[in-house]
Amino acid sequence: MTIEQNLAQIQQNIQHAVQQAKRPESAVKLLAVSKTKPVEDIYQAYQAGQTAFGENYVQEGVEKIQYFAQKNIPLEWHFIGPLQSNKTKLVAEHFDWMQTLDRKKIADRLNEQRPHYKKPLNVLIQINISDEDSKSGIQPNEMLDLAKQIQNLPHLCLRGLMAIPAPTDDLATQEQAFTQMHSLFEQLKQALPDAQIDTLSMGMTDDMASAIQCGSTMVRIGTAIFGARDYSK
């Protein structure tokens, strides 16, 4: 199957899940995870109508952003990997979204380093919803403190929450994590009524339907669009 065919199939799957959940047709946005994929693949996806892409590695992402900017192709770029403080400047300068914010130190650096001529950097707070030692993200009870600190930073725009639950085939376990995330998302909206809290980024290729059922507004799909990743490059 081509990238275009894969995208069409995924959009169909998203619409089916949205209908099953009795949610509006435009409720869920697709983020194409393009890490380790060449610009030719991204261009194919763009030609098929996909405009939002997620990258996990700073340097690789910046090179792709610059490539498409030079061609005047207007794509939306999301950073979705763990971010070390020595790499914040590149994310602040080049990306449109940063989905994995989990420390005030990183928020402060992104705010200071975001060019003033650009719109504020859209950010999501990453929650470690499955309480895994190996995962980035903050504990749920730390969410509101960090959110209020971000609200005071003029060059960041807090848009919501992101999570990567522990992988499992058990639907009940999937839904438990996603339901908890949706509850936190609603808490955040109530705590900050004047903020633009509209994005709950959760759900990947294998658990997308559960995530949409539980209120996800953005699913992050890579392999099902682009095929298996080649990490040797």
From Swiss-Prot:
Classification via InterPro entries: Ala_racemase_N, PLP-binding_barrel, PyrdxlP_homeostasis
PROSITE patterns hit by this protein: UPF0001
Pfam families for the chain: Ala_racemase_N (PF01168)
Entry-linked CDD domains: PLPDE_III_Yggs_like
Molecular function via GO: pyridoxal phosphate binding
Keywords of the record: Pyridoxal phosphate
Entry-annotated residues carrying N6-(pyridoxal phosphate)lysine: K35
Biological role stated in the UniProt entry: Pyridoxal 5'-phosphate (PLP)-binding protein, which is involved in PLP homeostasis.
Similarity comment: Belongs to the pyridoxal phosphate-binding protein YggS/PROSC family.
PANTHER family recorded: PROLINE SYNTHETASE CO-TRANSCRIBED BACTERIAL HOMOLOG PROTEIN, PYRIDOXAL PHOSPHATE HOMEOSTASIS PROTEIN
NCBIfam families, per the entry: YggS family pyridoxal phosphate-dependent enzyme
HAMAP family reported in the protein's UniProt record: PLP_homeostasis
Protein name: Pyridoxal phosphate homeostasis protein
Species this protein is from: Pasteurella multocida (strain Pm70)
